[in-house]
Structures are given as structure tokens and as C-alpha cells.
């Protein structure tokens, strides 16, 4: 029996995939700011340089946008016949010598004669070699240092790398180096600025804020349309993922990829909300110790109302369910467990407790027939698992 098809192009959901510049959603302001740092190099690359910090949480598009802007700039620089190169290095788990060796290695891959022995050389020798190479070729290098946080964590005081690169042009007759540092938290910036020798050169900071839910849903929709076949996902599912991704595009795309893989592996015709709950629950248990033992803290009646939400969601198979549908199951369960049902207004305390516990999200929406009602969703745990755990505690 042939498996149903989910993926049209799975590589487009890989975290390493970088969409082209014209397909990047949002970040127009940040793209313009970064490009404005590059553009003066086209006029006079030997008498202009810049140094800036790109700061923002993991997964908000910093590396993607800096890399794509750098590519666009390099295309333009060829039209101007400028001798400019861009090199991006990940500083994670590397010391200053390894970083400098990687810079020279990247230049060698671009066809330049920057071979240098990998052993028995000091950082100072590597730095001098790079300076001499750029000066003799009258080349301007834009150096992008990614993952600088881990580098700074291992070096509480200013390292030779940061000091020498911020002052790289001081001993040269031309401006031959521009520097971009990519960081994920402001603590790193604070540590860098503790040293006045570096601080005065790194005042230019471009902030990448977390995405809002609407933008994340738009990013997911664009990526899903390219990576997945039509009719295997609903817009509500993408909205569900966007809401639980903490403003991080990388996390949202990873959740979508995992849920799609789960549907594919289980021969499902489409990605369901329950598939998202399953992969999120696995992630939570693995990374954040999210566990159902927190159910013990809920009052007996609140557990029954939560079970009502679970059963209603299982019946409709949707991302969320209405108060009216939940109340139908709530009355049945109250009879099953021999307790008196509360009135709708009296359930507000139970709803609040469930929201605070993290098991349930609730929001009030307009309904087509007029008026407003509460909708409930469960995002962080499989409905089957939650039902089993609740019933075992309600015996």
C-alpha cells in the first residue's frame, strides 16, 4: 500500500534552508538598515568601514537576512568593479586562532592565495597575514561573526579577537575591514562593552524583535505552500503552531516539519492538530520537563471540565472547540462522575485555573449568529495522553 503524500519538497522545511531575499516575509526595516551599512562601500571601499551588532533571539531571522543582504551587496559590487569580499564565520566552540584560520580558509575557497599552516602559528601571526593580504590586494573584507555569544561566554574579558578586529584598520593606510557581530542576547553585548577598548567601536546595534503571531502564521503559510502538497494542512493548524512558537520562525517551521513527518510516517492523509500536540509534547518532555503530574494540583471539578474540553476537541478534530460543544460533554461527565454541574458563569474560576496551568488556551470570539463565545484549545500535549491521565485521576 502506497503511503499518502505529504511533502512536495521537504528540504524547504529544513532549518538550514535559507529562502531567497524576495521570499522573506517581514523584516523590511531591518533589511534596509543592514543594506544601508553596506552601500557606502560601493563608492569608496578603501576609505569607509562600519562595525555593528545584530541582536535578537534565536530563530528570528538574523543570520538569514544578513547572509542574503551580503549576497545582494556582492552582486551589486561586481557592477561597480570593487574589490570587496564577504566572509561569514560561526564562532561557536572555537577560539580566536580557529576563527582566524577559518577566515583565511574561506578566502582560499574563493580562489585567493591565503594558505597558512594550520599548526604552530600564533593569533598575532594570522592577524598580520590577513592585514598584509588585504593591504597588498587593496581588498575590503566584510567579516560577519555569527554565534558570538558562545565565544564571549568562554572569554569573560575582551579577547584578542574582538580587540584586534575592532581596531583592525588603525595600523593600515586604508579601511580594509568592516565587522558585523551577530548575538542572541543583550547580556553578550553588555559583556563586550565592559572593556572600554572595544566599547567605543560597537555602538551601532540593530535589534531583531520576535515575530508576532500574525507574521509567523504568514511565514508558515508561505513555507507550507512551497514544501507541502495542497489540502494536507489547514490555516487554523498554522495559526496553532504560530501561537506556540514564542515568536521564533525557526521553531515554528521545525514544529510544522515534525508534525508533517509524523503524519507521513503514520500514513495520514493530512496534518492534524493532534499531530502538532504530539510533537510539541515530546519536545516539552525532552527539553523543558513539561509533565502531566501538574494535573494533581487541579481541583476535581476542574479536571472534569478539562476532560470535557479534551473530548470535544477529539470529536471535532479541530484546533479549537466552542464553549457550547464543551458544555455538552461537561454535563455528561458530571452525571458520569456523580457531581452537580456548575452554571456557565460559575465555571470561570475553573477556566482561569486551566489557563494558568498551561494545559488550555481560551479566547473569546464573535460567532456568526451574533454575540460572543469562548473557544478552547489544547496545544502542548496529545489529547489521547491527556484523556488517559485525567481518567486515571478521576477514578
Can you describe what each PLM-predicted range is?
Residues 287-320:
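Short alpha-helical segments that sit at the start of domains
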Residues 313-395:
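Terminal-proximal interaction/regulatory segments of ATP-powered molecular machines
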Residues 1-49, 72-75:
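A short, basic N-terminal segment
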Residues 262-287:
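Conserved C-terminal helix/linker of AAA+ ATPases
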Residues 52-53, 76-93:
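Conserved catalytic segments around the Walker B and adjacent sensor/switch elements
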Residues 2-17, 44, 92-219, 229-244, ...:
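Mid-core helix/loop region of P-loop NTP-binding domains shared across ATPases and GTPases
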Residues 35, 302-309, 327, 348:
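Hydrophobic residues on short alpha-helical segments
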Residues 45-69:
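Walker A/P-loop nucleotide-binding motif
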Amino acid at each position: 500500500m502506497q503511503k499518502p503524500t505529504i511533502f512536495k519538497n521537504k528540504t524547504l522545511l529544513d532549518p538550514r534552508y535559507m529562502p531567497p531575499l524576495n521570499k522573506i516575509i517581514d523584516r523590511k526595516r531591518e533589511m534596509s538598515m543592514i543594506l544601508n551599512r553596506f552601500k557606502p562601500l560601493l563608492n569608496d571601499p578603501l576609505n569607509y568601514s562600519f562595525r555593528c551588532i545584530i541582536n535578537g533571539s534565536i530563530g528570528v531571522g538574523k543570520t538569514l537576512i544578513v547572509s542574503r543582504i551580503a549576497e545582494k551587496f556582492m552582486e551589486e559590487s561586481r557592477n561597480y568593479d570593487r574589490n570587496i569580499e564577504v566572509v561569514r564565520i560561526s564562532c561557536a566552540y572555537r577560539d580566536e586562532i580557529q576563527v582566524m584560520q577559518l577566515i583565511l580558509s574561506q578566502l582560499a575557497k574563493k580562489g585567493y592565495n591565503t594558505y597558512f599552516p594550520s599548526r604552530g602559528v600564533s593569533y598575532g601571526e594570522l592577524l598580520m597575514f590577513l592585514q598584509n593580504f588585504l593591504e597588498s590586494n587593496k581588498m575590503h573584507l566584510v567579516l560577519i561573526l555569527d554565534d558570538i555569544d558562545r565565544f564571549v561566554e568562554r572569554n569573560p574579558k575582551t579577547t584578542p579577537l574582538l580587540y584586534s578586529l575592532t581596531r583592525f584598520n588603525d595600523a593600515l593606510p586604508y579601511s580594509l575591514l568592516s565587522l558585523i557581530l551577530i548575538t542572541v542576547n543583550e547580556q553578550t553585548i553588555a559583556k563586550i562593552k565592559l572593556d572600554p577598548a572595544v566599547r567605543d567601536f560597537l555602538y551601532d546595534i540593530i535589534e531583531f524583535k520576535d515575530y508576532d503571531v500574525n507574521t509567523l502564521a504568514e511565514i508558515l503559510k508561505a513555507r507550507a505552500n512551497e514544501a507541502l502538497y495542497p489540502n494536507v494542512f489547514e490555516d487554523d493548524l498554522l495559526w496553532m503552531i504560530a501561537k506556540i512558537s514564542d515568536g521564533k520562525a525557526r521553531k515554528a517551521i521545525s514544529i510544522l516539519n515534525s508534525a508533517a513527518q509524523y503524519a507521513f510516517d503514520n500514513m495520514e492523509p493530512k496534518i492534524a492538530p493532534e499531530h502538532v500536540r504530539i510533537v510539541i509534547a515530546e519536545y516539552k518532555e525532552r527539553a523543558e520537563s513539561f509533565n502531566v503530574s501538574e494535573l494533581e494540583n487541579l481541583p476535581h471539578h476542574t479536571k472534569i471540565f478539562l476532560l470535557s474540553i479534551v473530548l470535544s476537541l477529539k470529536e471535532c478534530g479541530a484546533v479549537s472547540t466552542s464553549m457550547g460543544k464543551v458544555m455538552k460533554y461537561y454535563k455528561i461527565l458530571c452525571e458520569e462522575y456523580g457531581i452537580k454541574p456548575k452554571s456557565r458563569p460559575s465555571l470561570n474560576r475553573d477556566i482561569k485555573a486551566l489557563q494558568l496551568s498551561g494545559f488550555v488556551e481560551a479566547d473569546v470570539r464573535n460567532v456568526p449568529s451574533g454575540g460572543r463565545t469562548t473557544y478552547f484549545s489544547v496545544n502542548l500535549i496529545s489529547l489521547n495522553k491527556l484523556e488517559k491521565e485525567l481518567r486515571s485521576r478521576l477514578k
